Amino acid sequence: MSAQLEADVRTMSPEMPAMFDGMKLAAVAAVLYVIVRSLNLKCPTAAADITCQDTLLNHYLLKSCPVLTKEYIPPLLWGKSGHLQTALYGKIGRVKSPKPCGLRKFLPMQDGATATFDLFEPQGVHSTGDDITMVICPGIGNHSEKHYIRTFVDYSQKQGYRCAVLNHLGALPNIELTSPRMFTYGCTWEFSAMVGFIKRTFPQTQLIVVGFSLGGNIACKYLGENPANQERVLCCVSVCQGYSALRAQETFLQWDQCRRLYNFLMADNMKKIILSHRGSLFGMNSSRMEFADLSRLYTATSLMQIDDNIMRKFHGHNSLKEYYEKESCVHYIHNISVPLLLVNSSDDPLVHQSLLTIPRTLAEKKQNVIFALTLHGGHLGFFEGAVLFPQPLSWMDKVIVSYANAVCQWEKHKPQCHQQKE
């Protein structure tokens, strides 16, 4: 009997490792499947989807801006994941970011606030020979010292552009507020003050308006608020903005694309900025902020809660809906008449697909608007690279400067451009 059992053990034992190897192989296959799915490795690359009217100017701009119409190729292993593109942008901004040297300017505002911006002179002559200044509005809570801004400024300087970068009110950690007010979603006061300073100081310069994310909302709202704001403006470029805070409100509470998690993380960052200025914001004699409940700020888990308890009160809005309605560029952007490039990414986890009907419809109706939608890029990522390591310069940087160059050439040589088309 024991001999028979021993024989059975000898017969079964060689099969046991084979079974375990099969389980390991299945586990590895499952992990690889999850990686491939989460990194979207099977997703193709493509050129940006362009929406615009068939006009002479648009033909010229698309022909003169090949980076906009050629295939955008992100890093192979992770670049097709909007989450990783967004995370890398949020964590490091850009790789090997340069440190351009500029001068910090301080502008007193009528309400006692002090706007600041950094001014960077060009490092060469522009291809047109003209004096051209890029006026740049960064993303939420950002400023001129952020890596993605530094990279873009350095690249623009080398192309012959002067750059003026707004530091959002309260965003710089080493600059104290001088009034009980900080930046909001759509307040254009500081951006307007910076543009006004540039126009007065450099009376011959022409302007390129650039906005990133929240900065895109502010830039477009500023241009659309008053036709006079578009004087001496050659064009505007907006990247990764959401266009309507009211319509975005519901999407930010959804777990789709982990949007609720991003909402929590951004709210946590906003809390840190607000609390770093608690003495200036809540310690001064401010009738608008006396009803702000700091205990609700500490427990807030979404931007909407912070906006309702704190942000809307800076400008006396009676409700969150009123705040979002009046501070969104969707109600002003149709007033922009200068060439306007709107760039978004399909895999941006912060901007829901439903919001992209706004720029698409605008581009279909207005001759001066081009809407470019990429498959990949995340939120302000748009990294390029071969396999693993991204390049210092992003696709976004190249597109903005290339488009700006094309508009400048068009304005400089309009008769020749018309003849080339004919």
UniProtKB/Swiss-Prot annotation:
Upper lineage? Eukaryota, Metazoa, Chordata, Craniata, Vertebrata
Record the organism: Danio rerio
Active site, renumbered = 213 (nucleophile), 348 (charge relay system), 379 (charge relay system)
Name-wise, this protein is: Monoacylglycerol lipase ABHD2
Tell me what controls its activity: Acylglycerol lipase activity is activated upon binding to progesterone.
Cited function: Progesterone-dependent acylglycerol lipase that catalyzes hydrolysis of endocannabinoid arachidonoylglycerol (AG) from cell membrane. Acts as a progesterone receptor: progesterone-binding activates the acylglycerol lipase activity, mediating degradation of 1-arachidonoylglycerol (1AG) and 2-arachidonoylglycerol (2AG) to glycerol and arachidonic acid (AA). Also displays an ester hydrolase activity against acetyl ester, butanoate ester and hexadecanoate ester.
Ranges of residues in domain AB hydrolase-1: 134-385
Domain of life here? Eukaryota
Residues annotated as glycosylated are: 142, 285, 335, 344
List the Cytoplasmic topological domains.
1-15
